[in-house]
Structures are given as structure tokens and as C-alpha cells.
Amino acid sequence: MHLADLMEKSEGGQFLILSHLQQHSPSSLSEVMAETDFSKATLNKYLTLINDKAKENQLALSIELEDENLRLLVGSDTKGRDIRRAFLDNSIKYQLLIYLLYQGQFQAQQLAQELLISEATLGRHISGLNKLLAEFQFSIQNGRLKGPEHKIRYFYFGLLRKVWASADWKQELAKKERQTEIETLEELCGAQLSQGQRLDFVLWSHITQQRLKINACQFQEIEQKMKGYTDNIFYQRLFRRVNQLFSGKHIALSHEDGEMLVLFAFLVTHRILPLHTMEYILGFGGEIGNLTTQLIQEMKMQKLLGDYIEGPVTYELSQICGQVYLFTGYLLQDKYKYQLETHNPYVFSSHDYREVADTIFSKLPIFCQGTALDKKIKWEWLQLMDYIAENSGRQIKIGLDLTVGYLGYTRMTEVLKRYLEYNRFITIEAFDPASDYDLIVTNNPISLTQRIPVYYLKYDLDMIDLANIRHMIYQEEG
């Protein structure tokens, strides 16, 4: 599923234009028309609507037309999730999904009145939405969400993660209940979560709090799939802290196992737990560990792995296996996300592993769902191969030394990460003279005793700088 599938027809068309220009700006009118199949009149209408919507939502975003070329201009403080939300907010399908999350159920007549549409129109939207939700194996029936509970929450996690404003996250993170949950999890892991892990955890917890109001959650599938983990020592430790992990909310005894298994499923598949905790869990066996072992054996047969496998590699493989084992479907940001036909996930590798990926995954049918999750998993596996083959088991570390203030530093970090395809094996941090780096990006004169490549910025970080930085990394590692 693409995010645009949830939008109204006009907004979906506008979002398609935006998505193309985010990848290819500037583009000629003819190129955009060919890419979108819009007539010139429709394209011009949508361009006007995009600029109007940006003004209405106070987004620093505009599309300029000059000499038959379109150029997308986006302010440094404008976030992608704010843009996406602006195009979703008036969508009937999106409003319906949000209503179900926070209200749990609806009466068709009442909801149609609230949305200012007829019951027949509401029925058509529900029917269309159910066709989309089939990818995630749940549906809307009789005014309620019906399906495996872990898959419902997984879908909402993917949706809200793409549209929640910074204020939403800050508000949730500031709640005493969320802080207690984080502290409890950190205590159980014996390690602090990163800020990104905390944000993902509180979002999942927020969704959980809404779903706890539902008395008809279906846990049969997660209980069957995760039955090998109920005796796992880490799971049992989690279970003993059920009150702290669910904000003291009352959970029926018949639902305790189901609720905890859903939380456990999230923790072991979304890169929340630290490496040593995940190794501990995998050490006790279980279905995800077994699938990870199968994948490792197939990779060894292709001579991609030796006898010794580093912890970070096993960790990534376990996350990939956990996702395909427990979940189906994926909500793609746009049609270009994880698009291997036109982009590749490699930063350093000159070798293409796409064919060997097809060979390996064809032997493990669980990796071939026929959903958007296939694309995401294949992309992440190829990123891992890039890391294994070219970096000798070592993460690439980039230091930023910039006199631009906190906001400038944060923006440049986000831009650089976005350009490097959000490769999890590249870390970008504030420059520390006492640390070692593979590359330093700076707009200050730096005197170094050790030989570290330095890229000097003359002005703001632009596309030429980004291309040069990527080239320098490749040259150093290639």
C-alpha cells in the first residue's frame, strides 16, 4: 500500500507530483506529465492546488515553473511528515481509520453525519479501504476493526509514524506513564534506549493504550506464532512487569498473555532492544531464531558469510526475519520508496546483490508475501550486504563540525542521512576531537594530527556537497 492510496483522488495526484519532484527536481513539464500520466491542464491545476495547500497549512513549500521546468522548493524546517499529513487530513479513508483507533467502533449513520457524507458514500469508502487493508490481513466489519491484533497495531504504527507532528511525539514522550514504561524497559535491558528507539516505543505504546479499550481483540494468531517464547526468560521478566509496561491499566487475565506477546513481538522486530538483549533472546531458540538460522545457512551456501558472524549482522538478520514471520504488508511513503528498479541501496559496494537476494528468498517462501513488505525487506537485506562486503564488519562514522547552531546541525544531519538512504550502518554525530572518524564534514578550519578525510563546506549543504561526500566515502572504502 502507498500512502497516496488513502488520500482523496485530487490530493493523491498532487502528492504523486510532489513525490516525483522530491526525487527529480528540477524536472521538465513533459517529464512530469509522462511520469504521472496527467494532461497539461490537470498538471497545472494540481500545481496551483499544491501551492495553495502549502499556504493553508503554513508549510514552507512551493513549486516554481520557469522555462517549462518545475522546481520544488522546501524550507529547511519543513518536515516530510507535516507535508504528508496536509494531504491526508481531509481524506475520508484516513479520518475513518483515525476514528476507529480512538473510538473503537462506529455507527454508520452517525459517522456519515460527522463526515458530512451519505451512508452510501461511507459504504463505498469502507469497501475501498478494506481492499487496501487486505494486504495487512485485517478489515472493517460492522463498524469495528477485525483481525489479528498485532497486525492492526503494526499498520497503525506505520501510518502514524509517517504523519505524527513533532508536537505529538513531544506530548506523548512527556507523559509520566510513558516515562515509567521507558524506564522499566531500560531496566530490564540493562541499557538506555536511543532517542529514536524511545520515540518508536512511545508511539507503539500510544496505539496500545487506544486498543486496550477494545474488549474483542484477537490474540489467537500471535499466541500461536509466539508460543515458543512464553518460556523465554526475557519474556517472563517482561510479563512480571506488566503493570509498569501498560501504565497500570487493568488487563483481563485472559488477555494478559496476548497483550504481552504483542508488545514482545514489536520489541523483537523493530530494532528497539539493544544487541546484547536480542542475542540473549535468540539464544533460547524460538521461531524467529530458527528462521534467522535458515537465512544464515542460505547465505553461507552463497558464500556470503563465513563461520564467524558478527553480532550486528545476526541482529539485523533477526529483525528482518521477525518482520516477515509476524507481519504482512507495509505502508510505503510513496511509489519511489525502496524502488530497486531505479535506485539502489548501496553506498560503498560496487557489487550488485539483487540476483543472489532473489535466489535466497525464493528458497524461503515466507520472504515472498507479494506485498510491499517484500520490497522493504529486500532493500534492508541489500544494505546489510553492502555493510558486510565492503566495510569488514565496521560501521562508517561521520563527524559534523559546524558553526550553524543546534537547528542547523539537526537539519544538516537529517539531510545527510536522507541522502545516504538512511543506511543504518552509517552513524553521523557531532565532531569530538577525541573520537575517530571515517570522514569529517565541517565549515571550520580543522587541524588534525591523524589522517582523516575532511570535507569543507563553503556554504549551506547542497546537492553538490552531498554528491561529493558520498563519493569521498566510496573512495575511502572502495
Regions found by a protein language model. Name each.
Residues 1-478:
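A cross-family "folded-core" feature that marks the main globular domain of proteins
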